[in-house]
Swiss-Prot record:
Cited InterPro entries: FHIP, FHIP_C, FHIP_KELAA_motif
Pfam families, alphabetized: DUF5917, KELAA, RAI16-like
Family, similarity comment: Belongs to the FHIP family.
Protein name, per record: FHF complex subunit HOOK-interacting protein 1B
Gene Ontology CC, one term: FHF complex
Organism ancestry: Eukaryota, Metazoa, Chordata, Craniata, Vertebrata
């Protein structure tokens, strides 16, 4: 049905049923058929007298003859376009068409006119006139002309002549594409006629010819309406080829269509801006309004969307060939090196481009080859995915773009992606104590986990009715930006451009519109429950105290997010519950060794075995035979058994089976000691940190600290985060490890006070997105607060407890913390209100240069505040909420009482850079104190949503009972 709708849409875009330029069809429709036939024969008799001469060279008045033939031909074709079939015999040709077919009129006239090409004068003009006449005849004819062989023969002669070396011109190109487009529209109505245009080989051993197709290919990457019209016509041919094996084989075996598309993508990518310079520190992804304003990027996206559509409708041979060419001709030689440029700005640009491509692709086969490139292609011994994971720990801008990319990857609900990132490290269950393995599948029906998360809210962040009332500065919007931008810049309050995350805690997982997958869970904002509901606007006055009453909104959003993930994962190959897939793999084969990504395996780094690893089934279908005890895969799990490191971990107890029992006793004593420490920690956390001393963070082994340090290194020089080994050099293979992705996320979470507000929005959104997944291994790892992990494995609860302690320590050292916290909440609420009071089109669209220098900043609704070009009315609304005043204490911003002022309010110690750095540190910490409690509410709500959803997860009896939710689930072709 979608395909038919698509074809009808393309047909409606064609220039059919219109009067072509230069052709005024003022036909005397009142004339009877006999009169029209008599006039038609009279014109033809005069043309025949000219055609029967010796040729244009011998004729004294050759130019006059050419003009006369042109005029008579125009009159005849005008009459022929109005000819109708006889009512008594509707299938027979009309009288004029029957006469033209009998006389072979079109071919004789065209052959005579082509003789003039030998003179070399006016060839371009004559060719354009011929194309226009035939286009008029095809588009305006009242009868199916293409059913008749003489008409098709004349068209093929004209198309063959268009391949001769003739000086090209816009008029000639436009006429050719217009005629070809009309022919494709006519063939779409009668697909059986397509093979009649496939000419046999002119000589033995030569390839057949499909001029209708080959004349369109050179225009496939052309800019403007001409290129779009050529692509539409080619898409019609691709759809027709799906039902014609002959035409499909011709396109795949005897044309350069697929190489032209792939190499065209490479050439167009090389013209993209290598640096994306944006003034705001909240930018993190390219939106449609961004790339539409950049001609080079708009042309690339048009070609990429065309490739996506071709793979959707073309013959299977063409689909497979195009996918292979895109992988081997664009992704590997172009995108791979682009993602590993030494310049941080170029890394940011290439990562943003990749995220845009993944978000724009809808065809599973094309998306599969992009994911195969990310998961399996190696660059300098490491996969692309490992490199991207490591960059989460880099500077703020590169970190934000990388987080945005992983948000898009998780939105695909692809089993292969989640398996590579997290699940393959959790499947052996080495991260939990042996006695805790059965608890992986436990469901928290009594809300203990939710209670534990809520107990981590720092006391200093809880609402108190007697909050100090102080004059407020508008300095939150004028303070220094993220460390990744110039800290001396002054930013004013702007209006967000997309729906907010329910007015404050704004983290929109989907990117809006049709270019993103189905929205992932969005948490409600720091606003009162009814007022911040998406169905209504907030009240004019909202105080920070109301932010304590929004938990019901979190529950609604969490339920929607969990339900979406459950639906998207229903057909995964295994439930990942600690038993399926089994942690112990079957005997290792050659394909198993290839699948392992551990660096100590010493495999070939060229990545040449990707095709063999994937097999004919693509990313999801290959190398399943090594897991013989598993049922046949139904979806898209990465084929092959688990990593070699996991097998080594599982073999450790077997190798030590003959050791004395006292070792086991010592291990049990260590387990009891760790359990006692955990219980003490739980008691302290349940009291909300009210004791005289905050709970101490459990110390980590040296190996784990080194693992975290490897992902949080300085972004300059960029070398340290270009690769992400799965284990550090000093880490033993048997050491429990939850993978670099979770390690770098936890390390970034632990540094929430140092992150910018935009990084924290993206970061907490990604963790919440992971927590919504229904797999028991992942759910228990993130949300089960009673699970006892190995001493070397840090849990999310520990990370959050550490952040809580840091916030409380900061609040104790900051005398005016309550006022600063209230100021931060009011500012974010004001930013959320601007989104409701101002529509997305409230201001003129900004002009953008090719370098994206003036690209708009992301909005709060995109997880961040995208507002660089907000209208004046929105800025004034924000300034009314944040009425500036004089603050005698140490403040957060650098602004004074007027929008343009920049009066420092920090104690005058050190120089301006020191004051700005201190202001930025305080600003980030207080923003963290606003975000952190809301993140805890979100996690608590997600854990409760799992409790009412988990009993129905991956129920085989329900498989196939309904279509999956929107978004990308299975990768199987």
């Amino acid at each position: 049905m979608e395909r038919m709708n698509w074809l009808s849409r393309l047909a409606s875009r064609g220039p059919g049923h219109r009067v072509p330029q230069g052709a005024s069809l003022q036909t005397p429709v009142m004339a009877d058929p006999e009169t029209c036939l008599m006039v038609f024969k009279n014109h033809w008799s005069q043309v025949v007298r000219i055609l029967e001469r010796q040729g244009p060279r011998a004729a004294p008045g050759g130019a006059d003859d050419l003009s006369a033939v042109r005029n008579h031909t125009y009159q005849m074709l005008t009459l022929l376009a109005e000819d109708r079939a006889v009512p008594l015999v509707p299938t027979a040709p009309g009288p004029l068409l029957e006469f033209a077919l009998r006389e072979d009129l079109l071919t004789r006239v065209l052959t005579w006119q082509l003789q003039w090409d030998e003179l070399g004068d006016g060839v371009e003009e004559r060719r354009a006139e011929q194309l226009k006449l035939f286009e008029m005849l095809v588009s305006e004819a009242r009868q199916p002309l293409l059913r008749h062989g003489p008409v098709r023969e004349a068209l093929l002669i004209l198309l063959d002549a268009c391949g001769r070396p003739v000086p090209s011109s816009p008029a000639l190109d436009e006429g050719l594409v217009l005629l070809l487009s009309q022919l494709c529209v006519c063939l779409a109505r009668e697909p059986s006629l397509l093979e009649f245009f496939l000419q046999p080989p002119p000589e033995p051993g030569a390839a057949p010819r499909l001029l209708l197709f080959s004349r369109l290919v050179p225009f496939v990457h052309r800019e403007g309406t001409l290129g779009q019209q050529a692509r539409d016509a080619l898409l019609l041919l691709m759809a027709l080829s799906a039902g014609s094996p002959t035409v499909g084989c011709y396109i795949a075996d005897h044309s350069y269509f697929c190489p032209v598309l792939a190499t065209g993508l490479s050439a167009l990518y090389s013209s993209l801006p290598r640096k994306i310079e944006v003034p705001g520190d909240d930018w993190h992804c390219l939106r449609r309004e961004d790339w539409l304003g950049v001609p080079a990027l708009a042309l690339f996206m048009s070609s990429l969307e065309f490739c996506n559509a071709v793979i959707q409708v073309a013959h299977p041979l063409v689909q497979k060939q195009l996918v292979d060419y895109i992988h081997n001709g664009f992704l590997v030689p172009v995108m791979g090196p682009a993602l590993h440029k030494t310049s941080v700005e170029e890394m940011i640009a290439s990562t943003a481009y990749l995220e845009l491509f993944l978000r724009s692709i809808s065809e599973p086969a094309l998306l599969r080859t992009f994911l195969r490139f990310l998961l399996l292609h190696r660059h300098d011994t490491h996969t692309i995915l490992d490199t991207l994971v490591a960059r989460i720990g880099s500077n703020s801008r590169l970190c934000m773009v990388s987080l945005s990319l992983f948000r898009t990857l998780l939105n695909l609900s692809c089993e292969d992606v989640l398996l590579q990132l997290v699940l393959r490290y959790l499947v052996p269950c080495n991260h939990v104590m042996l006695s805790q393995k059965p608890a992986v599948r436990d469901v928290d029906l009594y809300g203990r986990a939710a209670d534990k998360f809520l107990s981590l809210i720092p006391r200093c962040c809880r609402h108190h009715a007697s909050s100090p009332s102080r004059p407020e500065h508008a300095s939150w919007a004028r303070g220094p930006g993220s460390p990744s931008v110039d800290s001396s810049s002054v930013v004013t309050v702007h209006r967000p451009s997309t729906p907010s995350r329910l007015a404050l805690f704004l983290r929109q997982q989907s990117l809006g519109g049709s270019e993103s997958p189905a929205p992932a869970p969005r948490s409600p904002g720091l606003a009162t429950s009814p007022a911040s509901s998406p169905g209504r606007r907030p009240s004019p006055v909202e105080e920070p105290g109301e932010l304590e009453d929004n938990y019901l909104e979190y529950l609604r959003e969490a339920r929607r997010g969990v339900d979406r993930c459950v639906q998207a994962c229903r057909t995964w190959s295994a439930p990942y519950d600690g038993e399926r897939p089994p942690p112990e793999p079957s005997p290792v084969g050659s394909r198993t060794k290839k699948r392992s990504l551990l660096p100590e395996e010493g495999r070939d780094n060229a990545g040449g075995g990707e095709e063999e690893e994937l097999g004919s089934g693509g990313l999801a279908g290959g190398a399943r035979e090594s897991l013989g005890h598993l049922p046949p895969p139904q979806l898209n799990g990465l084929p092959g058994p688990w990593p070699e490191g996991a097998k080594k971990v599982r073999r450790v107890p077997k190798e030590g089976a003959g050791e004395p029992l006292e070792d086991t006793s010592e291990g049990m004593a260590g387990l009891e000691g760790f359990g006692q420490e955990l219980r003490e920690l739980e008691v302290a956390l349940s009291n909300g940190g009210a004791g005289s001393e905050p709970p101490l963070e459990p110390s980590l082994p040296l190996e784990e600290e080194e693992a975290y340090e490897s992902f949080t290194c300085s972004p300059e020089p960029p070398g340290p985060f270009l690769s992400s080994p799965l284990r550090t050099l000093n880490q033993l293979p048997s050491q429990p490890f939850t993978g670099p992705f979770m390690a770098v996320l936890f390390a970034k979470l632990e540094n929430m006070l140092q992150n910018s507000v935009y990084v924290n929005f993206l970061l907490t959104g990604l963790v919440a997105q992971l927590a919504c997944h229904p797999q028991p291994l992942l759910r228990s790892f993130l949300l089960n607060t009673n699970m006892v992990f190995q001493p070397s494995v840090k849990s999310l609860l520990q990370v959050l407890g550490s952040v809580k302690n840091k916030i409380e320590s900061f609040a104790a050292s900051q005398e005016d913390f309550p006022a600063l916290l209230s100021k931060a909440k009011k500012y974010l609420i004001a930013r959320g209100k601007l989104d409701w009071t101002e529509g997305p089109a409230a201001g003129p669209a900004p002009r953008r240069s090719d370098s994206l220098v003036k690209s708009r900043r992301p909005s709060l609704g995109e997880l961040l505040l995208r507002h660089a070009h907000s209208p004046t009315r929105a800025r004034q609304a924000a300034q009314m909420v944040l009425q500036p005043g004089r603050d005698g204490g140490a403040g957060l911003g650098l602004g004074g009482g007027s929008p343009g002022a920049s009066t420092p309010v920090l104690p005058a110690r050190g120089g301006a850079p020191e004051r700005q750095g201190e202001a930025l540190r305080v600003k980030n910490a207080v923003y963290c104190a606003v975000i952190f409690p809301e993140f805890l509410k979100e996690l608590a709500a997600i854990s409760q949503a799992h409790a009412v959803t988990s009993p129905f997860l991956l129920d085989t009896s329900e498989e196939g009972s309904g279509p999956p939710v929107s978004g990308f689930g299975p990768l199987n072709p």
